[in-house]
């Protein structure tokens, strides 16, 4: 009894799985899949990825469809097995089997063949209703059920009848794993096996042969199912809830079967109580059978119900176990709370009584109707609270005896083992039997079969070939036309052969004509006739046209609509004057007025035939304009004649006449095309000639010679010359002429290859293409590589091939041995050098990044088993997304293809990047190949519109640095003007021009004229940069050798720097006719033809000559008897060092520039050029600007001049608004005066002196300088700025005579008898001279000249530490001599200026050089009157205090040779101002600078302090220094603001002698040698 109750429990294990499978099956029941069966069908269902499902035949095989199928796909036949359960229709089929079931491995769509077909019609027997259920087991990839319409032999249109009886069956399927199947799958499979075996017999064996589950009596092995608890209408198992369908089962073979009607089955027996005491739970279940034909149908009601059991207490003390206690607690609830639950469990609840009483229920019915049984009664514990415990058991049992004897039912013994399979191979049968023990005492006999039979299939029968056999033809399809002639077709499938059997013979499709009826033909209008002429020429008019009706026929309708119609013509208004292109004379042709939108045509020029076309269009503003004319229909007379001759030879060849003169025609065309084409029509004419020549070569009456082949290829190369680029672009507008070119070359390879008598190779290398033809047998073929090793190329571009093609030998195999032995293949490979630039494939974002390669094999192979390998070298840098493309005219562009590719296609090729500069293409077809690349974001423009960023950076940095150098030189030109500066500026201009031309040349490769000009000028400027370096070396050599530099020499410099490069370029252009200048890829000298030596040769010669000059200059510098002038020696050394640094860097720069320009793909050369070019600019600026002392001083002088001009030191205004007139000469003297006291202004002096030395001097000046240098030291001096010499005439007390008079104009300064102020200067030199100054006071003359600084604001302290060295005067070409003299008379005031004396000589002459820069503006000067005119003699203002009267000394009374010191100044720098300074008194100018008094006092105090340190006491005539009146002079405020200079010691302040009364001193001896400090030599500039 316990075993019977537990049996239905495991059924509920399937609930979660069934829910999931049914939901997935409903959502995705039908899905199309590959290899599922024959192609598209009206209704085909493919189930895959499902492990359980159900369908009905009515849903899968609709009545209105003739060919339907249902296919179940096995995920993996090695791991899973398919099982199917079919519930058949209750009535037999009315006809032959219409639904077939079979399994197969795969299906070939091309031949409509099933492979590995095995039929299950014998297993299922759908038309036999004697066995309501049928099962099968399938182990192949697909399990299919297909319904086929019976063939219709007498009807043209198949009729879909009502659904047959076989459409009423239903199917359940299950996919079970062969290893470790799931428990739920085994539960269902075991029940299917139980049902299958139960219904099996000899005529209907069971289709389930074996299972991976261990089934015991129809149940899967394993532990029993867990408890189930009902709750409402939900089926629960282990607390997992689900809908009613979760509890659905398909066990239709259980007892009380309701398989035909559907609904609930009978309740099972109560199961075992869950507890032995204390109250337990018993359950029972029932099964729902869905109604036939209703998929997924369920039953209403509860699947499981339960009741309490074993309510008696457990244990003697009234305590129960935990389970019983739980039941007690549950039973202790109120009766009204348990009412519904007890009713649900199905047993009556006890009567409600006293809450404290325990009432027993009545004794139950005896558990057995015969034999010994049990009776039970129960009671409830009614308590007021849950804490109260009831005493005594809750359940009681007692025995009940019945006198009746229980019947013994018949029982089956165990099944015998399965018998062996009836067949050793193929499908057979096996069975087993069992014995029934007879019943007793009226028991029931044994139920169920005594014998079970099932199919067995051990293995396929070997050794017996099974030929493929066709399935039945499908029904004819509907006629393609409802009337008149139509077509019908039907198909069939082949069951594939096995064991080496033959394939199905015949066609899988048949077609036949069908004719249902004559179609009525309606009347049909014929095409409209052309429109008549318009009634008006413009404006509103009308046109008429008519048509004819054809028909009707066979009852058709008549033509509808009018027979004629009218339309307006000239609806467009008459064109306005601005919408008509005016008459134009363009290209020596008169174009008449033409309205916009029309094309005008005129005859071609006299040397051509045809028409020139020119279209008139409207611009965006609606103004008519002429488009450029097109010469696509113009053919030159020469090309036209050759075209006519070629057509005549072709006509002869077609008639079988031998060809004579064909070679001459080709040779003539080579000569004509060598000079280029005049019109785009010449290109088309040449292509037509070559096409006709190919047809002539194809004829057997003419055999082409090697010369013909070479001329043919040469003509193709001439067509692709760079000069014909514009002609190609114009020809492309008329049609795809590139396609014609590819076809022409392919036909030529075919003809020439097969007309070769021997198996040999042919190579033709020209300037623009390389053609290779191989003829080889298929039997001995090897891999072909292009280009082959050891080939001879004439052009530089083809000597080192960068592109390679590999054709595998598998291409030449036909698959048949006999055919391979007799087959001969011709392989043609063409490498086009520049065809890619002619094709209209470049866009704003894409570029053709390689050469074009065409590969042809004749006869063409069916397919390429080994891909064709092509390696391309990239032509441009900065590109991405390299894509292999091929020429395919049959390919229809799709949405996924790149736009605007035209006949180019990316299909059929696979791109394999090799490195940054190479790409490999693997293609599965033969065609024309190239690489299409995408420009980067910064290069998103047309090809070669901008140079690379590297070139821009290199040229830009170099040009900017050199331009800055030029600007600096121009700004300080007056100070550094010299031959070396002129050479440097020309050198910089040549480099800047070269950089600009390099960048321009990168953008003009397509413009032939501009590119040629850029190449020529680049050649010129490259050479000029080398020549200017040579010019600098030459100038340095002439300087160290002492040659005179005059205008003739300077002209020679210009001729060398600019003339020699111009001569070389002119000769090169004249000899080559500019053909070598510029190529297709760069604007520079062509690497072919030797033109590059026109640059390399002169550049190398310049380098060698420069080295020789450098060696000579170096020897001159290091020799003992070399250069004695230190300044000249320093300049020569600097020039030599500049050449040694700049020249190698210049050579490296231009060498890398040539490599970068000619090989634009190499980023290394561009980077090297950018580095060298930038470094060259920095080095030139460093050598000639930053490290050049002259430039530094000139820049400082320029800055100081600007500051002084801003401060108003030019004397332009005063406090009271009085203007001060300062002449240029006064400014020169003022600049020199300020140089003495101001260290910072020393740069002005240095730059001025350097400029004076470097300035070209007249021969007389050179002689004077040499004579001056040979004289005594006392006669040597220089004037400020550009004053070249100072001549000092001795006084009576000075033992020196007057110097010889020089031819230059001298400015003579005479002293007055009155005592004058002394010379004051700054620097350590005065400290060393203090002792001499003191000792010479008594015997010196009473005269001196005071040189005052312009401003005190610019005075700065002397540097703390300054290197000192003593240099003898006669060793320095620029030495200065200071002549100081004081008067012995102490009574005369030292501040009294000298009386004005007329100059002893004529006016000074201005020098040829530029004057020095204007002095920087000083602080506001004191108010003073304007200087008197030169012809008047008023006394200048006194230098003393405002209260002191000015001294006015009278004229000189003694002889000038005894009483005066005459200082003669040779003013060569003022020669150009002779007329302006004729009446100027130099002494008056020197003493009118009252604003220098402050500085004068400070310097005088310094001299006094130095004299005191040498213990030289001043004379008693010294006067104490008077106090200055505050705020009476403007410089006093500055003095207070800035304080006392740092170099003035404070102990100098109490000195008694006034600095303004310093006595004059004179040199004790004439030949005194003055030790000069280094910086003082530079600062000391003016001597009096």
Swiss-Prot record:
Induction: By p53/TP53. Residues 1365-1584 are annotated as: Involved in interaction with MAGI1. It is found in: Cell membrane; Cell projection, Phagocytic cup; Cell junction, Focal adhesion; Cell projection, Dendritic spine. Disulfide bonds join 273-309, 277-314, 288-299, 366-400, 370-406, 381-390, 421-456, 425-461, 436-446, 479-514, 483-519, 494-504, 534-569, 538-574, 549-559, 581-616, 604-634, 884-921, 909-923. Glycans are attached at residues 64, 401, 607, 692, 844, 877, 881. The lineage of its organism: Eukaryota, Metazoa, Chordata, Craniata, Vertebrata. The chain crosses the membrane at residues 949-969, 981-1001, 1009-1029, 1053-1073, 1094-1114, 1137-1157, 1167-1187. The gene is ADGRB1. This is Adhesion G protein-coupled receptor B1. Residues 1391-1439 have a biased composition (Pro residues). Belongs to the G-protein coupled receptor 2 family. LN-TM7 subfamily. GO terms for molecular function: G protein-coupled receptor activity; lipopolysaccharide binding; PDZ domain binding; phosphatidylserine binding.
């Amino acid at each position: 009894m316990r075993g019977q109750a537990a049996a239905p429990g495991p059924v509920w294990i399937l609930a979660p799985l069934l829910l999931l499978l049914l939901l997935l099956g409903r959502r995705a029941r039908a899905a199309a899949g590959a290899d599922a069966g024959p192609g598209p069908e009206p209704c085909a269902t493919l189930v895959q990825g499902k492990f359980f499902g159900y369908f009905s035949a009515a849903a899968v095989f609709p009545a209105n469809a003739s060919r339907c199928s249902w296919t179940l796909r096995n995920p993996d036949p090695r791991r899973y097995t398919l099982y199917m359960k079919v519930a058949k229709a209750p009535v037999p089929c009315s006809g032959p089997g219409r639904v077939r079931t079979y399994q197969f491995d795969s299906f070939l769509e091309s031949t409509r063949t099933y492979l590995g077909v095995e039929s299950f019609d014998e297993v299922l027997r759908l038309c036999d209703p004697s066995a309501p259920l049928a099962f099968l087991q399938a182990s192949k990839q697909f399990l299919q059920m297909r319904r086929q319409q019976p063939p219709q032999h007498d009807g043209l249109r198949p009729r879909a009848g009502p659904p047959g009886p076989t459409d009423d069956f239903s199917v359940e399927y299950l996919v079970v794993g062969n290893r470790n199947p799931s428990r739920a799958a085994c539960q269902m499979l075991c029940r299917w096996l139980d049902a299958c075996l139960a219904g099996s017999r000899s005529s209907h064996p069971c289709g389930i042969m074996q299972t991976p589950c261990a089934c015991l009596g129809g149940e899967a092995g394993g532990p029993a199912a867990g408890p189930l608890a009902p709750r409402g209408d939900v089926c629960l198992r282990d607390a997992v809830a689900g809908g009613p369908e979760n509890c659905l089962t398909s066990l239709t073979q259980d007892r009380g079967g309701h398989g035909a009607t559907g609904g609930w089955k009978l309740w099972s027996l109560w199961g075992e109580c869950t507890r032995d005491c204390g109250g337990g739970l018993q359950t029972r279940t029932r099964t729902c059978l869905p109604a036939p034909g209703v998929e997924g149908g369920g039953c209403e009601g509860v699947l499981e119900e339960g009741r309490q059991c074993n309510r008696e207490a457990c244990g003697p003390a009234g305590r129960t176990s935990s389970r019983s206690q739980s039941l007690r607690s549950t039973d202790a609830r109120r009766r009204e709370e348990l009412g519904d639950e007890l009713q649900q469990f199905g047993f009556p609840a006890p009567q409600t009584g006293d809450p404290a009483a325990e009432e027993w229920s009545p004794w139950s019915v005896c558990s057995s109707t015969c034999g010994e049984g049990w009776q039970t009664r129960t009671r409830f514990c009614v308590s007021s609270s849950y804490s109260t415990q009831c005493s005594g058991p809750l359940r009681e049992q007692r025995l009940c005896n019945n006198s009746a004897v229980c019947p013994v039912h018949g029982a089956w013994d165990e099944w015998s083992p399965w018998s062996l399979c009836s067949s050793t191979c193929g499908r057979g049968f096996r069975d087993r039997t069992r014995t029934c023990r007879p019943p007793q005492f009226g028991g029931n006999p044994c139920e169920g079969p005594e014998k079970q039979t099932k199919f067995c299939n051990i293995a396929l029968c070997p050794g017996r070939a099974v030929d493929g056999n066709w399935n039945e033809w499908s029904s004819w399809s509907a006629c393609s036309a409802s009337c008149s002639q139509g077509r019908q077709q039907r198909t069939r499938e082949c069951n594939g052969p096995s064991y080496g059997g033959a394939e199905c013979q015949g066609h899988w499709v048949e077609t036949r004509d069908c004719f249902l009826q004559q179609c009525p033909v309606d009347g049909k209008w014929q095409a409209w006739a052309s429109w008549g002429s318009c009634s008006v020429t413009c404006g509103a008019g009308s046109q008429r046209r008519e048509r004819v009706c054809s028909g009707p026929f066979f009852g058709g309708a008549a033509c509808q609509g009018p027979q004629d119609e009218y339309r307006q013509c000239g609806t467009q208004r008459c064109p306005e004057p601005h919408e008509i292109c005016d008459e134009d004379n363009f290209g020596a042709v008169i174009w008449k007025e033409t309205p916009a939108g029309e094309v005008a045509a005129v005859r071609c020029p006299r040397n051509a035939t045809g028409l020139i076309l020119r279209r008139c269009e409207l611009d965006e503003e609606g103004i008519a304009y002429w488009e450029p004319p097109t010469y696509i229909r113009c053919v030159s007379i020469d090309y036209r004649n050759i075209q006519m001759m070629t057509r005549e030879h072709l006509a002869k060849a077609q008639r079988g006449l031998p060809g004579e003169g064909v070679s001459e025609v080709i040779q003539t065309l080579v000569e004509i095309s060598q000079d280029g084409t005049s019109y785009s029509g010449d290109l088309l004419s040449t292509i037509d000639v070559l096409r006709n020549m190919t047809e002539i070569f194809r004829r057997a009456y003419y055999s082409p010679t090697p010369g013909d082949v070479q001329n043919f290829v040469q003509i193709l190369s001439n067509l692709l010359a760079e000069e014909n680029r514009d002609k190609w672009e114009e020809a492309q507008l008329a049609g795809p002429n590139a396609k014609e070119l590819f076809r022409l070359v392919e036909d030529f390879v075919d003809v020439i290859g097969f007309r070769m008598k021997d198996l040999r190779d042919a190579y033709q290398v020209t300037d623009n293409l390389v053609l290779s033809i191989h003829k080889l047998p298929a039997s001995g073929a090897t891999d072909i590589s292009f280009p082959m090793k050891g080939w001879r190329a004439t052009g530089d571009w083809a000597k080192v091939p960068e592109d390679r093609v590999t054709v595998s030998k598998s291409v030449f195999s036909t698959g048949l041995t006999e055919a391979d032995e007799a087959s001969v293949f011709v392989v043609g490979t063409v490498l086009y050098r520049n065809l890619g630039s002619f094709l209209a494939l470049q866009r704003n974002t894409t570029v053709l990044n390689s050469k074009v390669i065409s590969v042809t094999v004749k006869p063409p192979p069916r397919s390429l088993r080994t891909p064709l390998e092509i390696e391309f070298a990239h032509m441009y840098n900065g590109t991405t997304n390299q894509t292999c493309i091929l020429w395919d005219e049959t390919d229809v562009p799709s949405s996924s293809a790149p736009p605007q590719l035209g006949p180019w296609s990316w299909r059929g090729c696979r791109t394999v990047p090799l490195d940054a500069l190479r790409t490999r293409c693997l293609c599965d077809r033969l065609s024309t190949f190239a690489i299409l690349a995408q420009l980067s974001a910064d290069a998103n423009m047309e090809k070669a519109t901008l140079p690379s960023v590297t070139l821009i950076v290199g040229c830009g940095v170099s040009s900017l640095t050199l331009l800055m150098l030029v600007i600096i030189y121009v700004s300080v030109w007056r100070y550094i003007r010299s031959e070396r500066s002129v050479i440097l500026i020309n050198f910089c201009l040549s480099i800047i021009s070269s950089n600009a031309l390099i960048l321009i040349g990168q953008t003009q490769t397509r413009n032939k004229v501009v590119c040629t000009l850029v190449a020529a000028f680049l050649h010129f400027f490259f050479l000029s940069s080398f020549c200017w370096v040579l010019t600098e070396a030459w100038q340095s050599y002439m300087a160290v050798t002492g040659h005179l530099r005059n205008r003739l020499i300077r002209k020679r410099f210009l001729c060398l720097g600019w003339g020699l490069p111009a001569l070389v370029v002119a000769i090169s252009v004249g000899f080559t006719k500019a053909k070598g200048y510029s190529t297709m890829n760069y604007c520079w000298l062509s690497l072919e033809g030797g033109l590059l030596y026109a640059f390399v040769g002169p550049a190398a010669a310049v380098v060698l000559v420069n080295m020789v000059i450098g060696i000579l200059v170096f020897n001159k510098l290091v020799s003992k008897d070399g250069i004695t002038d230190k300044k000249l020696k320093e300049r020569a050394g600097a020039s030599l060092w500049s050449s040694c640094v700049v020249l190698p860097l210049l050579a490296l720069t231009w060498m890398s520039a040539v490599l970068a320009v000619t090989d634009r793909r190499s980023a290394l050369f561009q980077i090297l050029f950018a580095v060298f070019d930038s470094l060259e600019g920095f080095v030139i600026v460093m050598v000639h600007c930053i490290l050049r002392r002259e430039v530094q001083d000139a820049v400082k002088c320029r800055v100081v001049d600007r500051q002084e001009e801003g401060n108003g030191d030019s004397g332009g205004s005063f406090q009271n608004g009085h203007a001060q007139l300062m002449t240029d000469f006064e400014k020169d003297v003022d600049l020199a005066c300020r140089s003495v006291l101001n260290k910072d202004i020393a740069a002005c002096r240095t730059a001025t002196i350097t400029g004076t030395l470097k300035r070209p001097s007249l021969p007389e000046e050179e002689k004077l300088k040499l004579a001056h240098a040979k004289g005594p030291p006392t006669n040597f001096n220089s004037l400020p700025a550009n004053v070249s010499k100072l001549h000092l005439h001795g006084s009576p007390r000075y033992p020196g005579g007057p110097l010889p008079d020089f031819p230059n104009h001298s400015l003579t300064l005479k002293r007055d008898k009155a005592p004058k102020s002394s010379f004051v200067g700054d620097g350590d030199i005065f400290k060393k001279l203090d002792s001499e100054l003191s000792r010479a006071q008594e015997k010196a003359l009473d005269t001196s000249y005071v040189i005052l600084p312009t401003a005190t604001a610019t005075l700065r302290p002397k540097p703390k530490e300054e290197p000192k060295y003593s240099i003898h005067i006669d060793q320095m070409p620029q030495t200065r001599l200071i002549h100081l003299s004081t008067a012995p008379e102490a009574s005369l005031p030292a501040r009294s200026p000298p009386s004005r004396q007329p100059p002893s000589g004529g006016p000074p002459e201005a020098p040829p050089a530029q004057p020095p820069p204007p002095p920087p503006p000083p602080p506001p000067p004191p108010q003073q009157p304007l200087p008197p005119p030169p012809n008047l003699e008023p006394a200048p203002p006194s230098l003393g205090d405002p209260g002191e009267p000015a001294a006015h000394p009278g004229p000189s009374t003694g002889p000038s040779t005894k009483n005066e010191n005459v200082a003669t100044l040779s003013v060569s720098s003022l020669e150009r101002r002779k007329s302006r300074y004729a009446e100027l008194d130099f002494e008056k100018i020197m003493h009118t600078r009252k604003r220098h008094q402050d500085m004068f006092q400070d310097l005088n105090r310094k001299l006094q302090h130095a004299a005191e340190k040498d213990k030289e006491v001043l004379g008693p005539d010294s006067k104490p220094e008077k106090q200055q009146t505050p705020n009476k002079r403007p410089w006093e405020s500055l003095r207070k603001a800035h304080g006392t200079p740092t170099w003035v010691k404070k102990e100098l302040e109490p000195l008694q002698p006034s600095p303004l009364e310093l006595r004059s001193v004179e040199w004790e001896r004439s030949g005194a040698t003055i030790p000069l400090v280094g910086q003082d030599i530079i600062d000391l500039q003016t001597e009096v």
